[in-house]
Regions:
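Acidic, low-complexity N-terminal propeptides/linkers enriched in Ser/Thr/Asp/Gly that mediate export
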Residues: 120-240, 406-471, 475, 480, ...
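Glycine- and hydrophobic-rich flexible loops that cap the catalytic core of alpha/beta enzyme folds
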Residues: 261-263, 273-277, 282-446
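C-terminal motif of bacterial Sec signal peptides marking the signal peptidase cleavage site
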Residues: 19-21
């Protein structure tokens, strides 16, 4: 025992020196100095005496774990994807470069960076210098990850990193196809220059809302926790590959900052996390950050439009993009990108640019330069009022909601996303036109998008003195709640933030009110609001940290809870169904579904068959009473409606199709989820629990193909299935940085997962370690205090370099 105490004491002295000695060991003014301790799972605890040195440490250590993804994100932000990687599948690299350049993101970066505060400039510059130090010391040819030897991995500038922030914040780069395809009808030469894939309304809506980036967020106040202090669950659903992965870190400036959490790769600071007094998470908002405008064109001049009866010219920005061919030679490709005074012109299959009308878009984040300011203010806040003031002052979160809790037991929700501020008259007129104008109605009723009359100035955004970006809704008019019980969000609008007391009366640009919610929102609502003795919070109806964790990992399928018994009852009435001329025996399927426990755990038999059944329906059916549900949505009972099986015959036909899929895949009808759903991490195939939105589960595991040059495991799609491949369900998206936090009398206590691991380097031990923990639902402790860090220290070092 004495020996162990001695070793721990020695470690504590080392850590105390590293984490708290900056003032005594202050570096010369011309030198960066950051002290880094790594604990289990590769988590860095970085201490510095100013933001420049803090960024220096962040940049170097982030490069150790993710040099390839950071380098790739900078290539994207520079508009150089086609230069290094060719035009890309369906010209996506070329289109991305054109739009990023046309928006002026890299061209304006120097001016925009110079307008940042001195502290921000120091932080960003320090980060780039830390990253560059890693590149110089290791050398591109000695990188052990997937970009080894790549000519696009090179030193970067502060302006490059600032461009990366702008690409993250703005919406237009995500919908490059609809912008590049917008050409005047007479411009035949330019129209033939680039083949643009047809984008459907649904695909457009997904890209605009970043809807593939989902999340759950729960915050509990003093009335709903066992100890009367705040609790938080952060559960962002983000990519497991590419540049939108999270990276975990602990940042310390003694006497000023002590923040633990995660941010997207290549970004300084913490976006989701906690300090001694405040903890928060984000979910992607359901708001309309972009609105569309229909322009009435001047006869004979399709590049001029009427505005309050007067003609106004569009502008063309001719882009010259360097493109690497398959033989390695580089050529130049030119094309014009067109703009109205609102923003880029756009084109859609059902709304092309004609001689009479054209569409344009306005992005509420086009002038948003204060993202780093807001997250920094949130990181530094020491009470909930200061945290809310960060939102009020900066008003800069581009597309997320915030759920926050505090040591004194407050639960706060803010939809701080940027949306345009329309007058009440404009809103009323637009609402009328959703009924009277077919295209306006199609935009809204089909996909929930806003189309306005761009030739009428009354649809301009209205200024407010508190708005940081002219024309956006200020903090005072954003949906928000400050409560002592709970709030939550699962990517639907603000309306059902609290089950018993919904939020009403906000701009429709923040999303619908008194409308059907997703099945995922509904299961989240049940988990957080249930205070019954047998509910997730136990007999007292108040959560402990473990109970909150278990609620998420209960992996309940609300869809199964609502429909499984009725499907089983229906299938017991028949022996077979004819599908596409084939008689399909349902006896085995009926038996398998009888044994399904309505959860999505690894040992849940019948879960795969049920998934294949529910995904035979269109996802939109899960919101209404039509083909799937019998009872309609009721605004007075939003958690429990719609419900009931609508059409037994269709249900059995879809069950037969699911049986066919299982047979083609070579899977038994009673296969468990663990036999079919995997993450491939290098040579490891790891079974993981969780499910898709249609299954009505909180713990999301999904399949997406993302922006990266790294290898991604792919399989051949099984005929008749939306997701199943010959390699199973290949998880590449879902639960990412999972944070469970409880404030106690002794400070914050947290446990977490970074589900895909801290490192993107396949040779690192931290490439698969946390995925295996997640598979077994084994939460790991977060090391926040000096004592805990000392006990778990795996390495320590001091990083220095010349200050820029």
């Amino acid at each position: 025992m004495k020996k162990n105490i001695g070793l721990w004491g020695a470690s504590l002295l080392v850590v105390a020196g590293l984490l708290g000695s900056c003032a005594e060991q202050k570096a010369p003014e011309d030198t960066y100095r950051a002290e880094v301790v790594r604990t289990s799972f590769g988590i860095p605890h970085i201490t510095a005496d100013d933001f420049g040195s803090l960024g220096f440490g962040e940049g170097f250590v982030a490069a150790e774990d993710h040099v390839c993804n950071i380098a790739h994100s900078i290539v994207v932000a520079r508009g150089e994807r086609a230069l290094y990687h060719g035009v890309g599948e369906k010209n996506k690299h070329l289109m991305s470069d054109m739009v990023i350049r046309a928006l002026g993101i890299p061209a304006n970066a120097a001016e925009d960076f110079a307008a940042q505060s001195k502290e921000n400039q120091q932080w960003i510059t320090g980060y780039t210098e830390g990253y560059n130090k890693y590149i110089r010391e290791v050398g591109v040819d000695n990188i052990t990850s997937w970009c080894k030897g790549a000519d696009w991995v090179r030193e970067i500038t502060p302006e490059d990193l600032f461009s990366r922030f702008q690409v993250l914040a703005q919406t237009a780069p995500r919908v490059a196809g609809m912008i590049v395809s917008a050409k005047p009808p007479a411009d035949k030469a330019d129209a033939a220059a680039l083949e643009v894939p047809v984008q459907t309304f649904a695909e457009m809506a997904d890209d605009l809302r970043a809807s593939q980036m989902g999340s759950n967020g729960w915050a509990f106040g003093k009335d709903r926790t066992e100890n009367g202090r705040g609790m938080l669950l952060g559960n962002p659903h983000y990519p497991w590959t590419g540049t939108s992965r999270f990276w975990e870190k602990h940042l310390i400036i003694p006497g000023k900052m002590n923040i633990y959490g995660a941010h997207l790769i290549g970004a300084p600071g913490v976006a989701i996390g906690f300090n001694e007094n405040i903890g928060w998470t984000h979910t992607v908002s359901n708001s309309e950050r972009v609105v569309f405008y229909k322009l009435d064109l001047v006869p004979g001049d399709p590049t001029s439009y009427y505005y309050d009866g007067e003609p106004r010219k569009m502008t063309a920005r001719k882009m010259t993009i360097s493109v690497k061919g398959e033989d390695g030679t580089v050529t130049e490709q030119e094309q014009s990108v067109w703009f109205s005074h609102y923003g880029p012109m756009v084109s859609l299959p059902n709304a092309p640019w004609t001689e009479k009308q054209a569409l344009t878009m306005r992005d509420a984040n086009a002038g948003n330069q204060n993202l780093l300011d807001q997250w920094k203010a949130m990181d530094l806040a020491q009470d909930m009022d200061a945290f809310k003031d960060a939102h009020r002052k900066w008003n800069a979160l581009p597309w997320v909601n915030t759920m926050a809790t505090s040591k004194d037991g407050r639960a706060v929700f803010i939809d701080g996303s940027n949306v345009g501020r329309l007058s009440a008259e404009a809103i009323a007129l637009w609402q009328e036109r959703t009924k009277s104008d077919p295209l306006t109605g199609e935009f809204f009723n089909g996909m929930g998008l806003i189309l306005l009359d761009g030739s009428d100035s009354q649809f301009e955004w209205q200024a407010h003195p508190e708005a940081r970006v002219p024309g956006i809704v200020p903090y005072v008019e954003q949906p928000k709640y400050d409560r002592s019980d709970y709030i939550f969000n699962a990517n639907d609008s603000h309306w059902l933030t609290h089950v018993e007391e919904p939020l009403n009366g906000y701009s429709p640009l923040f999303g619908s009110e008194q409308a059907a919610r997703s099945l995922r929102t509904r299961i989240n609502a049940k988990l957080v609001s249930d205070t019954s003795p047998d509910g997730p919070a136990g007999v007292d109806g108040k959560f402990s940290l473990k109970e909150m964790q278990q609620a998420l990992f209960s992996n309940r399928s609300l869809t199964a809870e609502l429909l499984l018994d009725e499907v089983v009852a229906a299938c017991t009435k028949v022996t077979s169904v004819i599908v596409d001329g084939e008689e399909v025996d349902l006896a085995g399927a009926c038996t398998a579904l009888k044994g399904y426990n309505k959860h999505l755990d690894l040992d849940s038999t019948g879960a795969v068959l049920f998934r294949e059944w529910i995904t035979q329906y269109k996802y939109t059916e899960t919101f209404k009473n039509d083909k799937l549900f019998k009872l309609a949505f009721d605004p007075a009972d939003p958690v429990n409606t719609p419900r009931g099986l609508a059409d037994e015959g269709l249900a059995l036909k879809n069950l037969a199709k699911a049986v066919q899929v299982m047979t083609r895949a070579g899977l038994a009808l009673d296969s468990s989820l663990g036999e079919a759903q995997f993450v491939y991490r290098g040579a490891d195939r790891i079974a993981v629990h969780g499910g898709e939105n249609a299954e009505g589960i909180a713990n999301i595991m999904a399949q997406r193909i993302y922006d990266t040059q790294a290898h991604q495991q792919r399989g051949a799609k099984v005929e008749g299935s939306k997701m199943l491949t010959d390699k199973g369900y290949l998880v590449t998206h879902g639960a990412s940085f999972l944070l469970s936090l409880s404030y106690t009398d002794d400070g914050p206590v947290a446990e977490a997962f970074l589900t895909y691991g801290q490192s993107g380097d396949p040779t690192s031990v931290h490439y698969t370690d946390q995925t295996k923990l997640f598979s077994q639902k084994q939460w790991r402790p977060v090391r926040f205090t000096k004592q805990d860090i000392a006990k778990d220290m795996k390495s320590s070092r001091v990083l220095t370099g010349p200050r820029k």
